[in-house]
């Protein structure tokens, strides 16, 4: 690590701790040349996922897009932001664990819906109505019937 003051590469770690919110290791360092203290973060390097959209175009995976969609579908619902972060993290890691470099937007939506259904069913219907592009009330009702059947099976 280069010192930000003198550019020396000689430094020692004086403190190290886990930075949960960043999924990283935070290290406090001291330059052995000039004595300046500075902070570095160590992150896991992950490969980029490419999303293949419905129209065939490709773009880099964006967890912010997933999170924004979840926030919109959960507006005025009793869902904590941390729950949405957790869903987003789980979806990202599930996709990476599958080992593909490209993933369809359809697969991403399915992962999100599977997790969101267990957090808040109204938010699930909101998300599904946009994701599945419901054309009429019948499609919406069919989705809700699926939730009701799932509830009856889990209650039995």
Swiss-Prot record:
Protein name: Transcriptional repressor NrdR
HAMAP family: NrdR (MF_00440)
Position of the signal peptide: none
ATP-cone domain segment(s): 49-139
Function: Negatively regulates transcription of bacterial ribonucleotide reductase nrd genes and operons by binding to NrdR-boxes.
Organism name: Staphylococcus aureus (strain NCTC 8325 / PS 47)
Family: Belongs to the NrdR family.
Any one biological process term the GO annotation gives: negative regulation of DNA-templated transcription
PROSITE patterns on file: ATP_CONE (PS51161)
Keyword line: ATP-binding, DNA-binding, Metal-binding, Nucleotide-binding, Repressor, Transcription, Transcription regulation, Zinc, Zinc-finger
Domain of life: Bacteria
Alphabetized GO MF terms: ATP binding; double-stranded DNA binding; zinc ion binding
Cofactor: Zn(2+)
Pfam families documented for this protein: ATP-cone, Zn_ribbon_NrdR
Co-factor binding details: Binds 1 zinc ion.
Zinc finger (unnamed): 3-34
